[in-house]
Amino acid sequence: MSFIRLHKDAAAMWLSRLLPAAIFILVGLFSIMVIRDYGRESAAARQTLLEKGNVLIRALESGTRVGMGMRMHHAQQQTLLEEMAGQPGVLWFAVTDAQGVIITHSNPGMVGKSLYSPSEMHQLNPGPQECWRRVDVAANGETVPALEIYRQFQPLFGMRGHGMRGHGMARSANDDEPAKQTIFIAFDASELAATQAREWRNTLIVLSALAAVLLATLLAFFWYQRYQRSHRELLDAMKRKEKLVAMGHLAAGVAHEIRNPLSSIKGLAKYFAERTPAGGESHELAQVMAKEADRLNRVVSELLELVKPAHLTLQAVNLNDIITHSLNLVSQDAQSREIQLRFTANETLKRIQADPDRLTQVLLNLYLNAIHAIGRQGTITVEAKESGTDRVIITVTDSGKGIAPDQLEAIFTPYFTTKADGTGLGLAVVQNIIEQHGGAIKVKSIEGKGAVFTIWLPVIARQQD
């Protein structure tokens, strides 16, 4: 059963990582496709207008060429242009000279007027190939978007050598060359503009939907990770409590069965120590027996301290005062080992709800462990600061020998110790007290470079069950 549960947990973990990655990839690919396809419909509509304009321009050139062969004049060319301007979507036709003066126009009243200034004609620089641009023109009393197509007007192209000299065509200063003319045709681009607006709107909607999917995936992923973390922490807490319950039954039996004999052993050891000469072997053995009885009694007391619920006396406390007081308690021991204690009070630190005696017990345990890890000549640094609006952080950093990576995970486990004379219950008690305050404690260390213990405490503590 445990194997099946482990297999399901592993599958859920991999799915929680692969599914967001797959969604990110699909959203990215779909976004690329949407962006790449943006403008295709409007480009196709614009190309249709360009091809239609090219056909009409060539038709006008052909008609003009035929009319010239039949000795037709500007009047016939004007009539032909007016008839072609009646095509659907055509706003106007115009043929101008190099200075922008209208020679023929679909609106006869425009003939002889200036369509564009010479400087504008120079900027347009019409050539033999069709060019286009977007303009706004007045039509039926309102301004409409238009697609203007223009190029050199070439009705004589291919006629030389056939005896045609360009009848009815304006001549340049050099009588051998006709004056350069430009043909303009303007199409109603309202549908093209609507198509572009629709494309932009649809693309924006699709990209917004993709962004929403991406954001929802990110939120779901982070919420799932948060749920998994909370779930793991809850399972760890349940395991610890189950272990503490089992240890509580054991501790109760141990305390009952061991303490009474220990008291007798200690009493007898003191009795023999008093009855033997000081400095003798028997006297020293009796003292060793008494000390070992005290140590075993202390182990039983710490075990009971660990397994029984901590009854906190919560009150508003100033962390600066707690830290300063606890450092003073170990200052003599640190000074004898040439260990510097560093702490700068944080005057902006808010008061928190905590049990001052229990908190002092926690800090003393961390200081003593740090002093033991340093040995001689080192530094212990304590810092306190706020974390957001509802938590404070206390860090205890030492310059000791550090903790091996394989020991970090077990450092808060009861009876795990790296000291020859340690019981392995100190940090377990520390963790229990911090968790009773509704906080947490973590440790980071690089072997040979010291350790950092970090405590998170809520500003308003509620004793945990």
Swiss-Prot record:
It catalyses: ATP + protein L-histidine = ADP + protein N-phospho-L-histidine. GO terms for molecular function: ATP binding; phosphorelay sensor kinase activity. Keywords: ATP-binding, Cell inner membrane, Cell membrane, Kinase, Membrane, Nucleotide-binding, Phosphoprotein, Stress response, Transferase, Transmembrane, Transmembrane helix, Two-component regulatory system, Zinc. Residues 36-203 are periplasmic. CDD domains: HisKA. Residues 1-14, 225-465 are cytoplasmic. It is a multi-pass membrane protein. Autophosphorylated. It is found in: Cell inner membrane. The modification Phosphohistidine is found at H256. SMART domains: HATPase_c, HisKA. Its EC number is 2.7.13.3. PANTHER family: SENSOR HISTIDINE KINASE, SENSOR PROTEIN ZRAS. This is Sensor histidine kinase ZraS. It comes from Salmonella typhi. The gene is zraS.
